[in-house]
Amino acid sequence: MAARLNLGLLCVVIALGLASAPSCGDTLSDVQKRGYLRCPIIEASPGFSSINAAGEREGMDVDHCKVISAAVFGAIKIEYVPITPQTAFTLLQSGAVDVFPGGASWTFLRDTAMGLDFTGVYLYAGQGFLVRKSGRIHSIADLDGATICVAQGTTLEQNLADYFRAHRMRYRAVTFGNIERGLDAYQADRCDAFTNEVTSITGRLRELVNPQDHKILPGVISREPMAAAVRQGDPRWRDLVLWSFNAVIAAEELGISQANVDEMRKTSGSAEAQRLLGVYGDYGAKLGLSNDWAYNIIKLVGNYNDQWQRNFGPLGLDRGANRLWSDGGLLMSLPFR
């Protein structure tokens, strides 16, 4: 999430001139010739990227990689590249990876000054706080005068400063290079609260020594629209990634799931569903793909709700703003027409 991307590093990249570097070429052709997608993954982030008991990678970011692979190959062919917050964008800029699947807040500076293109919001998040149940802090207002653990050089650190300044509240930040060290410091009583995006805190809460002794405060202090990113200057690849993510949202809107996609392909009377699933039209060709590209995505990875329930359901995370627009949320697919 936002904490996983270092703003200080982004400034260094800009200073070095990498943001204005030319595109590395036709990414789709490169991926097809190579025979697999190179996908960066930040390790040990429950709900987003982790390894399960069977030794398999799982999480929303992992599923995003699978979505792109399914669209391109009709199969899951991925080389996962472990990264840190400090290397995320430099690897993408250099061409060492093909896409950044998630974890980036879509902000003005990242969109205009980093040589990146974002491909639509896939997760609406917000920055919150983890505190001890036994303490005096029961609301964000109670954080006045608190010591707060936060990841250094991130949008989280900037949000913290902006919010406390705007509300004339005092705080002392204890900064760390990554989330794990910040949580360790919080558990060692070096700070009164730990801050991160609520989705990330929810995933990590169960990893604490005594999770029942902690709680997430109600409310958030920021808006974090999360989106995948690709290199600027490669419009065909951007379109492919953007429409692949739209396909999983459109599938949920149309009632097409991993469980019923074969039946819906045969029986759906919806013209948009038939276009999406490749029954007629040549939408795949317009992306440089086979006409069953979206069918393959849904068959192999599922629609948005399939992915949410698989990755966030076990964490008890409510979809909230990530519900479909028809259910009172903010998610809406661009039309397939």
Where are these regions (language model features)?
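Short helix-initiation/N-cap motifs at beta->coil->alpha
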Residues: 78-90, 173-188
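Bilobed "Venus flytrap"/periplasmic-binding protein-like clamshell domains
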Residues: 38-47, 57-72, 105, 125-181
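C-terminal functional modules
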Residues: 273, 277-337
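Extracytoplasmic small-molecule ligand-binding "clamshell" domains
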Residues: 25-103, 283, 287, 304, ...
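Extended ligand-binding regions for polar small-molecule ligands
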Residues: 62-70, 133-137, 141, 146-147, ...
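Bacterial N-terminal signal peptides that target proteins for export
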Residues: 1-10
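Acidic, polar ligand-binding/catalytic clefts
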Residues: 66, 70, 74-142, 198-221, ...
